[in-house]
Amino acid sequence: MITKLPQVLSPIQVASIIQLIEHGSFNSGKDTAGWHAKAVKNNLQWQGETELNEQIQTGIQGALTQHPQFTGAAYAKSMMPFIISESTLGGGYGDHIDDALMVNETVLRTDISCTLFLTPPQDYEGGELVMNLSGMEMAFKLNAGDAIIYPSTTLHRVNPVTSGSRKVALTWIESHIPQASQREILFDLDCARKDIMEHHGKTDAFDRITKTHANLLRQWAMT
């Protein structure tokens, strides 16, 4: 399931993050790529002082985890620290798959990948996030402050930037619900019950769907 998350960050929050980023520097991003992806990774990665990084991490992670659609789609168990990535002229990231396991304080299984856009789409050309879905490609270029989450099993790339500069924040999530198909079922049930509540109130149908949602979550969740 691919889910767009609108306005994770407000324009003021985006401007604040960009201002913090300006106090650090960008270096080659190849060091964080898996061995099979180094050859196609051509972007830059932000580095800054610990205090700056903590402010960025706190601001972005807090906004993402409080977003109502993220909560219902991800069932996040743990999350990698955000990486701030920049692609300038000619920069991008060829077709690759994200590493299945990543290490922070512990080993994290990557179930969900997340890209949070920090640059308005009109400020750069190219730079689309392109996903290969069983041979069909879908391209995404969202507004600054918007995010997209998708299964980490997805083959994807970032097209080369042909003008301007593209900045994004990236993270990977281990979910309490490892299977994407099960997360989608839970998400659909959650949306359906919220729609019933909004238009009809707490009906018998709402209670039955809520019961089913809770019991499936109980059956599938890994704690």
Curated annotation (Swiss-Prot):
The keyword Oxidoreductase applies. InterPro entries: Oxoglu/Fe-dep_dioxygenase_dom (IPR005123), PKHD_C (IPR041097), PKHD_hydroxylase (IPR023550), Pro_4_hyd_alph (IPR006620), Pro_4_hyd_alph_FE2OG_OXY (IPR044862). Its EC number is 1.14.11.-. GO terms for biological process: DNA damage response; intracellular iron ion homeostasis. It holds the Pfam family PKHD_C. Coiled coil: none annotated. It is an enzyme of class 1 (oxidoreductase). The keyword Glycosyltransferase does not apply. 2-oxoglutarate binds at residue 166. This is PKHD-type hydroxylase CPS_3426. It comes from Colwellia psychrerythraea (strain 34H / ATCC BAA-681).
